[in-house]
């Protein structure tokens, strides 16, 4: 079985996340997708509480399930109650799926900072890496800046210009976000009054 790990704060999950997951599952032939909710860097600044983000991630997984994608939400990082390291998360997932192929899905910006990660050198021995990069030519830099050989990492052109920050800002400004979010997540945000300025 091919298992993929997709982590983030998901504050909130949006259509860009959804599009990436749909694209990854089809392109990489992923059998199971794990959505890992990380510690929230925006806590106390209009960000949702940990449990709310986990619930929105569950709604997001439900959206994936509706189109036939097997998805589950992991709260392992949240349960640690402190910032965790990607290598530790991967080791945890590997312990749950010891015999399966494992791929880490990450964005290009995160990948270019990978040398600052704990034990980054051993990541290729634990999982495959799929790096989703912006498709505009001006955003592409020389592959020589990548810390691994070209055969270790799969580069995938993908561009969906949307961020959770934009959504939080639009909600705070009372601007519409209906076309940026799965409907279940939009309803959750409205119901719980998330991202509104005090």
From Swiss-Prot:
It is an enzyme of class 2 (transferase). Its EC number is 2.7.7.18. GO terms for biological process: NAD biosynthetic process. Catalyzes the reversible adenylation of nicotinate mononucleotide (NaMN) to nicotinic acid adenine dinucleotide (NaAD). It comes from Chlorobium limicola (strain DSM 245 / NBRC 103803 / 6330). Signal peptide: none annotated. CDD domains: NMNAT (cd02165). This is Probable nicotinate-nucleotide adenylyltransferase. The keyword Transferase applies. It catalyses: nicotinate beta-D-ribonucleotide + ATP + H(+) = deamido-NAD(+) + diphosphate. HAMAP family: NaMN_adenylyltr. Pathway: Cofactor biosynthesis; NAD(+) biosynthesis; deamido-NAD(+) from nicotinate D-ribonucleotide: step 1/1. It comes from the Bacteria. GO terms for molecular function: ATP binding; nicotinate-nucleotide adenylyltransferase activity. Keywords: ATP-binding, NAD, Nucleotide-binding, Nucleotidyltransferase, Pyridine nucleotide biosynthesis, Transferase. Belongs to the NadD family. InterPro entries: Cyt_trans-like, NadD/NMNAT, Rossmann-like_a/b/a_fold.
